Amino acid sequence: MIESKFNSQLKQFKDFHKGQSAIIFATGPTIKQYSPFEGSEECIKIGLNRIYDYPQITEDLDYYYYGSHYYTDNAHKQKIDKICSEYPNITSLASAFEEGRSHEVIGRGNITPERALELGSIPFENNLSSFTNDISTYSTLGHSIVFPPLQHILYMGINKIYLVGCDGGFTSGVDSESQELLFWWKEFVEFKNKHYPKPQIISINPVSLKGWFHDAVVK
């Protein structure tokens, strides 16, 4: 685990949703098949990056995670800004640091911590090598925007996680299975089984992750 200089503010989330269930909405192709299921209304709802393309989901979110391509895709930037300004009830968190450096210095196009704060978001730090079960002391593994919220909500005490639109790729809305991403999913499974053996993970309409967790078909 890699110590973080920037994640101490995440301490407020320790066991914040202890014993509750959550849905993570990613934007792989199967997001288009999603429909609410029994018990979904009571779940904590987390949306990722381009989930704004699905307003019926966005308007019910409790958390929104974003960061990449903020300065390289103006339409994307404007839609992030809109979520942060028009949905004050959504707690937004931004991937704004990586391995001890601000994304202003890194220059890859991710949002800077200063801009994240202007939008009312919580900037946090990722790394490229290890997951953590103490997100306020150590940086979370990045590589994909799906991994930080997984580490965050386990830290929050969530005991059941539904994965929607987590199809094993980096490209929103189209099939784009990535072996790199699947490698980190495998690492996540090992991390989760070691540090959080009790919480249950359920893949809704799984594709690349079929058989990795509990599978469920919801249409």
Each language-model region and where it sits:
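Metal-ion/cofactor- or nucleotide/acyl-coenzyme-handling active-site neighborhoods
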Residues: 1-219
